[in-house]
């Protein structure tokens, strides 16, 4: 009898405190708890790690070295495990060739469909291509001028690897004397040995002829032989290098354009048989972007209009200044003329050069003038020429991608784009969103023969499109690049792909699949998770969404606090059991005993506005948006409605450029008014505060510098001549040199995971003995870094500068975090709160705008309450907080809502409504308003 439970005993990974738990198999199980309580440690670092490790250990040691080996979790016992599949928040491939269609494998089925029932057309006239008769071929060949010498060849190998010795033997046996190999003609006895690792093309020369009026009979015989040998294809090459291809398979009778039998690889933009020859299937080419080189056209050349090194100064002693000044005399501009005032010809000369014309100029070096003749190649051409030189990587930031001029971004060759199914070519079909594509296949009319051929293919395509729709991704197109997807979108795509694979008996572990999903689409996601469970799988979800928890079979609540205060199973059972449990914080929110209150009144703001005009990035439809300043503002809308395009691509990038002098490039818009009311923009996301174990909350907030300076002021340090640098574990001097200040040493185990052992010299304290002997209030630098924020607050209570920074960390709910805790061990929510604390500790001007993209990711309802307290503190100081959010608890507390939509993708990109939560709740067109209404009491609406 199969096991009914997954049993874990003595789990001690990270902050887990000897956890024992039983998880029912073949059920939908939710792990929940505060950010940093140990949910991910139990789900991913224990359950998934052990499930994956056991699978990998069943393989040979040779195979294991090619697979990601996971550490053995620190636990006593675990059984009832199934093979584990993790579907986490990491974005999909950044490979520019990867698309939604290829990741979901729908594109593979589409290629098969087009190869089997696609109708070819002539790419020139658009007429349907039919098979070419032998007489038609002969008529076209007979049109060659009299006296033309030509060869008739049969292609027998087309771009295939190998030595192809049998091909040459068969040609000899057939009585043929010559072959063309990779474009070169050889007698059969002198063919070189081919490289079997390279692709080769081989044509057998069937006949060599001279065009005469009486040649038709011989031509007919030779052509029939050639077509038989070349599987219906014949190639004619004239002595001047001209070539004609004929096909018994498909060819346009009017233009003579022939095609081989359709095959799936011809529809792949990753194959030379189908890819656009100009861009090799990329659909775009990299060029120097004018808008990146000259980001602000209101500036002059002398004022720093050109953002590229080497062109920023235009003084007499600069290399380019005198030359551009000479060009300007011809085209009516000076070094002090704003770029926006240049004539069209003048701007073209500046950017693209003046050809071969020479200018007589004087360059000054060290006060001495040197005369010379020089030509001007143009800024863009100069940058392009430097790309391939040493140090050319610098110029990559000034490059941009533009659609390929040959295929217009369609990635495929014209012949392949001329093949249609249901009147659409494969690019046009992939450019439809998921809903439209599904409708296309449901309405597709086929002949009985086509239906028989395509039945199974269409079944798979419809099912996979349906899965994408069921996880709330109906607005995506199959042509969308994978690298442009958000973490939540990428995760739901992988979820849809897993459903398509129809595996049974697997343990799926998902990390907050509801991220980035509007409440409207949440029920679809829950249905999908239930479908995965009902096919015979165990589905474990790390989640904070109340709707998902209520739909689950079993909840494991981890806590009671976070970090050192967490790591225990507070409650486990059905949603009803959790709601009744008095010690469960999750139960308190689920049952309504605790809730985030609606503010009694909304802020009035300072009366100023930030106005975005003509926003057109991605799917935004030329919208104008007013953002009130001095308020807590929420941008809402279904997935794909244009929130990130408006806030991140346009507003954040433009404000960063104008206020922070950042080198950013905003999306398409006309203007932003009201920037003069702000002096700084701060983006606070959930990315790690550092990528190495050496970074920690103390280094990020600047607290470590203050602590080191404090230790350098102690009598002991002064007596020994120690400076603040002595107390850094990042530089030589005070650190332990055996572990270079890491506190641990890494021992490589090759096909086993690397082992980290505590340094036996400093015993994990990171500093050498001399440094540790320096004490402040009886504590060494290591002792201070090992304190929690809570302990540090008491210890440094007499030091206002340190206490203020520690107090803000404590206020955002990070009292349990150690001052020197490695940043790599912090969750996304914890990293975000460290950033918020850093901002809170600064003395603000009240003219800052804080931009946050889904700040509640990974946060429990209780964490959300703390986050809202911090965000409101920022607003109380006169600042503006702008968040993109789906969490209704955050939306209901906002002062102002900007709701985009109404749908995602093409159906979005407009402003549905704006106003207070009460006003939005009354809007009939707003999906956000519909779900917001029940949360606001009737007296408030």
Describe the predicted segments one by one:
Residues 1-941:
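Conserved phosphate-binding elements of NTP-dependent enzyme cores
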């Amino acid at each position: 009898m199969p096991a009914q439970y997954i049993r874990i005993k003595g789990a001690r990974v990270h902050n887990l405190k000897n956890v024992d738990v039983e998880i029912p198999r073949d059920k939908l199980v939710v792990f929940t708890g505060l950010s940093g309580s140990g949910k991910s440690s139990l789900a991913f670092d224990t359950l998934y790690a052990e499930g994956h490790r056991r699978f990998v250990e069943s393989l040979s040691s040779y195979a294991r070295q090619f697979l990601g080996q996971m550490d053995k979790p620190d636990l006593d016992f675990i059984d009832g495990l199934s093979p584990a599949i993790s579907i986490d928040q990491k974005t999909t491939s950044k490979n520019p060739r990867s698309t939604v269609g290829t990741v979901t494998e729908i594109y593979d089925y589409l290629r098969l469909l087009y190869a089997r029932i696609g109708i070819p057309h002539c790419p020139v006239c658009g007429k349907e291509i039919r098979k070419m008769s032998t007489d038609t071929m002969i008529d076209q060949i007979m049109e060659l001028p009299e006296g033309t010498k030509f060869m008739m060849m049969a292609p027998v190998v087309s771009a295939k690897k190998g030595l192809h010795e049998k091909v040459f033997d068969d040609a000899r046996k057939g009585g043929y004397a010559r072959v063309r190999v990779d474009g070169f003609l050889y007698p059969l006895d002198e063919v070189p040995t081919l490289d079997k690792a390279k692709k080769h093309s081989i044509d057998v020369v069937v006949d060599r002829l001279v065009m005469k009026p009486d040649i038709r009979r011989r031509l007919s015989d030779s052509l029939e032989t050639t077509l038989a040998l070349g599987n219906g294809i014949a190639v004619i090459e004239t002595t001047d290098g001209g070539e004609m291809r004929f096909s018994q398979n498909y060819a346009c009778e009017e233009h003579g354009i022939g095609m081989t039998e359709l095959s799936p690889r011809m529809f792949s933009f990753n194959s030379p048989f189908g890819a656009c020859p100009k861009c090799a299937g990329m659909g775009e080419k990299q060029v120097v972007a004018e808008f990146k080189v000259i980001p602000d056209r209101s500036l002059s050349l002398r004022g720093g209009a050109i953002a590229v090194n080497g062109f920023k100064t235009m003084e007499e002693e600069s290399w380019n200044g005198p030359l551009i000044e000479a060009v300007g005399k011809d085209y009516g501009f000076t070094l002090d003329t704003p770029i926006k005032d240049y004539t069209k010809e003048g701007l073209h000369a500046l950017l693209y050069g003046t050809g071969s014309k020479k200018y007589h100029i004087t360059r000054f070096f060290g006060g001495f003038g040197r005369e010379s003749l020089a030509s001007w190649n143009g800024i863009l051409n100069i940058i392009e020429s430097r790309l391939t030189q040493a140090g050319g990587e610098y110029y990559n930031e000034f490059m941009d991608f533009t659609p390929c001029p040959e295929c217009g971004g369609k990635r495929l060759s014209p012949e392949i784009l001329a093949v249609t199914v249901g009147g659409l070519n494969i690019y046009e079909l992939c450019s439809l969103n998921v809903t439209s594509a599904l409708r296309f296949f449901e309405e597709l009319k086929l002949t009985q023969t086509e239906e028989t051929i395509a039945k199974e293919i269409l079944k798979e395509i419809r099912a996979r499109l349906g899965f994408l729709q069921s996880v709330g991704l109906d607005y995506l197109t199959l042509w969308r690049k994978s690298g442009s997807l958000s973490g939540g979108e990428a995760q739901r795509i992988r979820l849809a792909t897993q459903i398509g694979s129809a595996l049974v008996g697997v343990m799926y572990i998902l990390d907050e699949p509801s991220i980035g999903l509007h409440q409207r689409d949440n029920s679809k996601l829950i249905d999908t998770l239930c479908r995965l469970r009902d096919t015979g799988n165990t589905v474990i979800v790390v989640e904070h969404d109340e709707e998902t928890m209520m739909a689950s079979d079993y909840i494991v609540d981890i806590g009671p606090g976070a970090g050192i205060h967490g790591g225990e199973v507070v409650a486990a059972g059905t949603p009803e059991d959790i709601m009744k449990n008095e010690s469960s914080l999750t139960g308190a929110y689920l049952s309504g005993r605790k809730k985030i209150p609606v503010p009694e009144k909304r802020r009035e703001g300072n009366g100023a506005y930030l106005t975005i005009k003509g926003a057109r990035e991605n799917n935004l439809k030329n919208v104008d948006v007013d953002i009130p300043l001095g308020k807590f503002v929420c941008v809402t809308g279904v997935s794909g409605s244009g929130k990130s395009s408006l806030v991140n691509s346009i507003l954040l990038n433009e404000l960063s450029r104008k206020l922070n002098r950042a080198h950013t490039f905003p999306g398409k818009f006309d203007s932003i008014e009201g920037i003069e009311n702000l002096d700084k923009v701060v983006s606070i996301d959930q990315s790690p505060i550092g990528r190495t174990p050496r970074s920690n909350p103390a280094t990020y907030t600047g607290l470590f510098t203050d602590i080191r300076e404090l230790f350098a002021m102690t009598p002991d340090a002064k007596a020994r001549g120690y400076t603040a640098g002595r107390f850094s574990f990042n530089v030589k001097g005070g650190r332990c040199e055996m572990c270079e200040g890491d506190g641990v040493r890494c021992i490589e185990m090759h096909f086993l995971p690397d082992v980290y052992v505590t340094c036996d010299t400093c015993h994990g304290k990171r500093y050498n003995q001399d440094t540790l002997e320096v004490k402040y209030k009886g504590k060494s630098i290591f002792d201070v870094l090992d304190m929690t924020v809570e302990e540090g607050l008491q210890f440094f209570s007499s030091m206002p500068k340190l206490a203020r920074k520690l107090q803000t960390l404590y206020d955002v709910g990070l009292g349990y975090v150690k001052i020197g805790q490695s940043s790599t061990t912090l969750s996304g929510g914890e990293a975000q709160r460290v950033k918020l604390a850093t901002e809170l500790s600064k003395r603000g001007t009240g003219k800052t705008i804080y931009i946050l993209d889904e700040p509640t990711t990974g946060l429990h309802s209780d964490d959300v309450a703390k986050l809202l307290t911090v965000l409101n503190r920022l607003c109380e100081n006169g600042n503006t907080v702008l968040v993109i959010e789906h969490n209704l608890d955050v939306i209901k507390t906002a002062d102002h809502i900007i709701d985009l939509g109404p749908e995602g993708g093409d159906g979005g990109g407009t402003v549905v409504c704006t106003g207070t939560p009460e006003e939005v709740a009354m809007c009939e067109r707003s999906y956000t308003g519909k779900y917001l209404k029940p949360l606001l009491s009737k007296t408030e609406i």
